[in-house]
Amino acid sequence: MGTIKSGEIEKGSFLLFKGMPHIVLEREFSKMGRGGAIVRLKLKNLKNKSVVKETLKGADTVEEIEVLEVSSQYLYRDSENLIFMDLETYDQFNVNLREVPNIEDKVLFFQEAEVYSLVKWDNEVIDLKLPPKVAFEVVAAEAAVKGDTVTNAMKNVTLHTGLVVKAPLFINVGDKILVNSETKEYAERVKE
């Protein structure tokens, strides 16, 4: 997109920093008496998800980049790839599990025929976004012990994608539950 001065950087901007795409998480502008202005940034690398803090002088320039979010339908998974379909062109494409960082944490949340947001930079998928909560069907649940409710009793339940989470004792096989996609914890039962 072009270069911008450090004073023009906003929270949420996408920058090419040290050859890697980053998003600005925090920005703090300071004007030092005769020393000039400085900008403190907290940046998240979009490829490896590391977070770094950087300080730039007011006259420094950085390259702003364009990152696209594309809605695509998840079709299926083979041994090394997730297969998606572009909703505009109906073309199918692969996302290699080894090429997208931290994707293994998200794979068990993907459900066939659901639409997900893929983050692309330089025509390459660098992230897959999940909704905050995802609905699953319970396919296996440990038996609840009657009277075991002195504390907030939880049991392991297995969901139809293979994900195992802790859920309250009243959750049974066949129930649908919402799971927080960030914490991988039970959120609530889906009301039908």
From Swiss-Prot:
Its main location: cytoplasm. One of its GO terms (molecular function) is translation elongation factor activity. GO terms for cellular component: cytoplasm. Pathway: Protein biosynthesis; polypeptide chain elongation. GO terms for biological process: peptide biosynthetic process. Keywords: Cytoplasm, Elongation factor, Protein biosynthesis. Pfam families: EFP, EFP_N, Elong-fact-P_C. The keyword Cell inner membrane does not apply. It is found in: Cytoplasm. InterPro entries: Elong-fact-P_C (IPR015365), NA-bd_OB-fold (IPR012340), Rib_uL2_dom2 (IPR014722), Transl_elong_fac_P/YeiP (IPR020599), Transl_elong_KOW-like (IPR013185), Transl_elong_P/YeiP_cen (IPR001059), Transl_elongation_fac_P (IPR011768), Translation_prot_SH3-like_sf (IPR008991). Belongs to the elongation factor P family. Involved in peptide bond synthesis. Stimulates efficient translation and peptide-bond synthesis on native or reconstituted 70S ribosomes in vitro. Probably functions indirectly by altering the affinity of the ribosome for aminoacyl-tRNA, thus increasing their reactivity as acceptors for peptidyl transferase. This is Elongation factor P. It comes from Borrelia hermsii (strain HS1 / DAH).
